[in-house]
Each structure stands twice: as structure tokens, then as C-alpha cells.
């Protein structure tokens, strides 16, 4: 209630004197990362703001400030005044998962990887209209394109969409279509592997096949590979297209 403005459907910062600030930033997504919003409020923010192409769902989504806000600034220096931050992409995975918005995650992952490109520009922020990575450097210094959260974001999106991710006492498997690949996670003496043909996937625990799945699914299992639930990454995905 302290940050949420029900008339506008988002959270807003307050200054040191507790006065609400009117600028529409991405910070409601941060609250979703911490799972601190009631589900109806999160759903309203996603529907009204996050997925609005006039605000946050730009060609390169997740600008720090809504692009139609008077205080939005598309500047290349890293100051959170407008451009899409790699750190926000990293946080967005958990934020969207907390509230079941799984189908937004593949779009974000692919947009980020396209922006990073074959030149591997792991920078702090990206132009929300073009995806251009501004490579900033101080005079006499090499370009700063080795930003840790950008690298970690790519690793995590890859694991969520095409691989397997240990999440506490569960595993999250991704069978996104479009690329044939093999992904293995090894922890201590255990291995979890998913082999994706580009239109379906097979999952293995310690070399033992535990299920096959159709394309564009997000499958949650226990650590032994027993299926707990299935969700869709794609609009046409079939959660029943899983065989043990």
C-alpha cells in the first residue's frame, strides 16, 4: 500500500520525505522479483504496463523508465534513466516465474541474445528501440563489454529455455523449439541432461531417461525427474504432450 498507486496500477518510488514520485519506472518488476506483490496487482502491472509497447514492451523490452514518461532519457551512459538494463533482464526471470507469466520469458531471452549478438557485447544496458549495445569506455581504457549480469542472464535464459535449472529441491526443464541442442547440469555426483531435437526433447537423470516432451514446454520435476507440473512457454504448446 505504501508504494502501490491503485489509480495507475503500479508501484512508485517515494523521496526521503515520503512524497510519491510520479515517474513510471520498472520497479514494480523488482517487487515481483521479491514476490512481495499480491497476485492481482502483479497481473495488473503486467497487463497494463509491462506488456504495453508504448511503455515497457518496446522492440528491446524492459526500459528502466517507461518510454512515454516525460522523464525517460535514452542516454548511453549507465544511470537507469531509460535504457534497458541487463540486470533487469536477469531479475525478470524470477519475477515473471513468481506470478506464472512463463510465456513472456522466451521473448525476453531471445531479445537479449539478439542484442548481445555474435560480437558478444555483454554491456550494462541496451537501446530500447534498436537493441544497440552502447559500448562505453573512459579515455585510454578498453570498452566495457564484460558486464557480469549480462553474462549471467544469457546463461540463465539458456538454461530455462533449452536446458535444466536446479531450483531449490526441484528441477526446471525447458523444451523450447527452434534449435537442436544438448544441455547438461552436473551437481556433485548427479547429472541432469535434456536433448532437444528442435521440435521436442528427451530428459535424463543420471543417464536414465525420465520423460519426453513436446516443444515449448516448461516442466518442473523433483530431483529424481518425477513430474510435478507442466506449463507453456508458447501459445500453441500442449502441456499434455509429455510421455514417461
Predicted regions and their residues:
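Short, surface-exposed linear patches
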Residues: 53-57, 72-73, 225-226
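Alpha-helical solenoid scaffolds that mediate protein-protein interactions
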Residues: 1-2, 112
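Active-site-adjacent bridging/hinge elements
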Residues: 4-9, 61-71, 130-133
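Glycine-rich, flexible loop/turn motifs
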Residues: 7, 20, 58
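Generic long, charged, amphipathic alpha-helical segments
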Residues: 58-85
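C-terminal beta-sandwich/jelly-roll accessory domains of carbohydrate-active enzymes
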Residues: 197-244
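C-terminal capping/lid segments that line or modulate ligand- or cofactor-binding pockets
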Residues: 10-49, 53, 78-193, 198-203
Amino acid at each position: 500500500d505504501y508504494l502501490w498507486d491503485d489509480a495507475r496500477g503500479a508501484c512508485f518510488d517515494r523521496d526521503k520525505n515520503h512524497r510519491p514520485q510520479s515517474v513510471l519506472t520498472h520497479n514494480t518488476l523488482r517487487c515481483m522479483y521479491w514476490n512481495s506483490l499480491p497476485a492481482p496487482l502483479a497481473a495488473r502491472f503486467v497487463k497494463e504496463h509491462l506488456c504495453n509497447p508504448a511503455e515497457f514492451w518496446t522492440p528491446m523490452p524492459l526500459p528502466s523508465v517507461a518510454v512515454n514518461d516525460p522523464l525517460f532519457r535514452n542516454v548511453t551512459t549507465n544511470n537507469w534513466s531509460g535504457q534497458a538494463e541487463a540486470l533487469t533482464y536477469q531479475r525478470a526471470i524470477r519475477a515473471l516465474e513468481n506470478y506464472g507469466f512463463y510465456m513472456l520469458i522466451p521473448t525476453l531471452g531471445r531479445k537479449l541474445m539478439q542484442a548481445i549478438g555474435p560480437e558478444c557485447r555483454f554491456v550494462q544496458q541496451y537501446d530500447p528501440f534498436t537493441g544497440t549495445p552502447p559500448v562505453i569506455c573512459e579515455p585510454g581504457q578498453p570498452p566495457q563489454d564484460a558486464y557480469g549480469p549480462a553474462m549471467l542472464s544469457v546463461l540463465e535464459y539458456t538454461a530455462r529455455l533449452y536446458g535444466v535449472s536446479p531450483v531449490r529441491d526441484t528441477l526446471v526443464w525447458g523444451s523450447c523449439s527452434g534449435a537442436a541442442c544438448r544441455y547438461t547440469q552436473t551437481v556433485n555426483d548427479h547429472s541432469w541432461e535434456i536433448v532437444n531435437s528442435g521440435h521436442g526433447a528427451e530428459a535424463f537423470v543420471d543417464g536414465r531417461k525420465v520423460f519426453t516432451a513436446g516443444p515449448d514446454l516448461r516442466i518442473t520435476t523433483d530431483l529424481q525427474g518425477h513430474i510435478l507440473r507442466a506449463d507453456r512457454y508458447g501459445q500453441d504448446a500442449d502441456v499434455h504432450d509429455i510421455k514417461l
